[in-house]
Amino acid sequence: MTTLAVLFSGGGRTVLNLLNKIEDGELNAKIVLAIASKNTISGIDILADRGLDIAIARQDMDTQEDANNKISAWLNEAKPDLILLCGYLSLLPIEPWMQGKVLNIHPALLPDFGGKGMYGMRVHEAVIAHQKATSGCTVHFVDEEYDHGPTILQETCEVSSEETPK
């Protein structure tokens, strides 16, 4: 069984999908650590209702450095097989033991429409603004840069001229 740590910054939809796959027996994994980027995001209650204990990286007065130190300690204690960035918006410092274990899902075909601040609806708006005929998603290993690192998988979809970001 693969042990997973998940980090999220929003509603937790990707983590919910993982939980469903695990519960349905489609994914032989266990989430051993769930980390919310800050204490105000909606996914905390949603995922807690599904039985996950949620660690909060950044409380009201914490700096990002404080949050990164907490995350590092939690990850070093849990030592998961894989660390999944499930809509996690901060840059995660990659420690040597984490190389090749941290994966990100990005809602575009990287390297296009990636980088700091390019997430969610912003990515889809950029795809439409650039009149791209195709878009898609990328799963990649994470390195020290936003939306960078070796690609694992890309899936494409057509974008019609009538398409909206939603």
Task: Go through the PLM ranges and name each one.
Residues M1-K166:
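One-carbon transfer enzymes
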